[in-house]
């Protein structure tokens, strides 16, 4: 395997991994990615962001590999400008989500389609803020009946940490056959169709690219990255990741502010590629 970058697939999370905590791309990461790709390596992103949001960061890297969006719900081929895989929440799942939402008055709901973020009612501060930060296409739906159907790549619940834990437990105990869910912060719970996760997305992409599983690597920083880290042969996390994330990783890189992706690329080159 030595000196053959073309046999390798490296996948990175965006927030708190590729980018630093101020949501900027460290120059050391960009340089390392460029070197890795120029030598024949395959690099891409896997994020909970929707396609429009992911594209902002993808386009800075000069890569062409299909990317994984909405936590594995979709894969987009930028070279062909087409979605090559999309697995949204089912119609029955949509009804369950809306039923949960209706029972908790302080709960906020954001629905993520491939290119549009739908904000359920005027109280959706979380969805509004993330839409404004990256100037993303969004639509305010004053009534849940106004939410489109069949395009729910993922939904995000926002509330107090106590309420979010309650919703997480509810979904895992009563609706486990319909959804997978994971915390992206103490206040946000993301919900996707059953079987959808970053790991499944990476595995699907690996098969599409016909890359051996033993030459797959990924780096992340939080609990929504666990499936991805468990799927690849060489998992890494950023230095600021929770301790239980570090325990499942082969390599713990530096803090994301200092260029964790570059650190991991250097590790892979030193130990496996060069």
Model region roles, listed by residue range:
Residues 35, 99-100, 170-173, 244, ...:
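Alpha-helical scaffold elements within enzyme catalytic domains, especially in hydrolases
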Residues 14, 49, 221-222:
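Active-site metal-binding loops of divalent metal-dependent hydrolases
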Residues 24-126:
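Active-site phosphate-binding/coordination module
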Residues 2-4, 8-13, 17-39:
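N-terminal glycine-/serine-/threonine-rich phosphate-binding loop
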Residues 29, 54-58, 167, 171, ...:
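Hydrophobic packing residues within well-ordered alpha-helices of enzyme cores
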